[in-house]
Amino acid sequence: MKLSKKVAFIAAVTSSFILSSSPAFAGQINGSGATFAQPIIDVCKVEFTKDTGHTVNYTAGGSGKGRTDFFNNLVDFGASDAAYTSGFPAHLEYAPVYAAPIAIGYNLPTVKTPIYLSPAVIAQIFSGEITNWNDIRIRTVNDGEVKVPVFATKKITVKVAGKNVTRTIPVLDAKGLPKITKYNVVDANPNLPNVPVTVYFRSDSSGTSEQFLKFLKGANDGANKELWPKTATGTFSNSTPVPLSNFFNFQGANGSALVAAGVKSKVGGIGYGEVSWFADNKLPTALVQNWAGEFVAPSSAGTSAFLGGGTINANGSLDTPYQKAIPGAYSIGTASYGLVYPESAKKDPEKQKIVAAWHTYLLEQCPKKFPEKGYTLITGALYDKAKAQIAKIK
């Protein structure tokens, strides 16, 4: 009799715990925007549903589409790699919850060693000035010794699909910046072929394009400013030094997935996009020279180092320093933003709770669960700002 009562008590307590651990309701939120964020959203929303019971629907139509849909109140949240420059919504907060490198992927099957590119050469390729892979300007950068940082890493255990898995992530110092264990001095000598360059670019309104164009202008400002004099916009073809109609070797594509697919389809192809799109297509990516003279691969650690030198604005957006000597910095790293409604928008408070929980999950859990996607675990002052912005979602 006593045993039966004890079992009944345990069952009641267990049932109460399960109920209290479950969400009060299972809700659904809808988002729209950047293809830059799509790889991490696609894998992480499944885990979010398992952990919370809530469903996230996301349509990746580009940052411009996300900003438009958010402005028109068609979604519960947006995602954009760039801030609004006009047509501001009446109620808006930026939550910097995504960060990753914009990689330069290429298709040169005969080249078996990494390719190294300087900001000047990248500008000359994407402006149409360099049209062949064995151009002397590319060969000069890839001739001789280059300095490459090696970042410290550690293994952690996280739960994915209900199972404990081991992941490798960068080791951070007290300031939240990645630790560099050493520098490798590499003899750069790829056998660059006599193959025409075909440039794949985003033809849609794209925050990824805008951030890439900011790099092309910012990193070449000063002595090389003539290489990329135009101000960055979300439309690549509107921001090139010379109209693309002057060239036969430029191919537009709608979205990062199609840019990467285009590069894969053409020997000699080159394009830009979030690093996982090229990894998924088994394409190599270039190491990019930073202002300290180092050549850095597109990685979460290099992105973290670069963003750590940026200036955080009051609205949650970030200005990045292209001409600042930051050890280990990958200079085409970018923060990307959740577009969210603050309390003043008077949105459904229950949905707002889900939006806040989703952005917290993106900020704190997703990069650790899926480091292979290349996204940076945001830390330090930018993390604090992201948390403060998320707290405004009510």
Residue locations for each model-derived region?
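Bacterial N-terminal signal peptides that target proteins for export
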Residues: 1-10
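Cleavable N-terminal signal peptides
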Residues: 11-14, 24
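Sec/Tat signal peptide C-region and signal peptidase I cleavage site
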Residues: 18-26
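Flexible loop/hinge segments at secondary-structure junctions
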Residues: 25-394
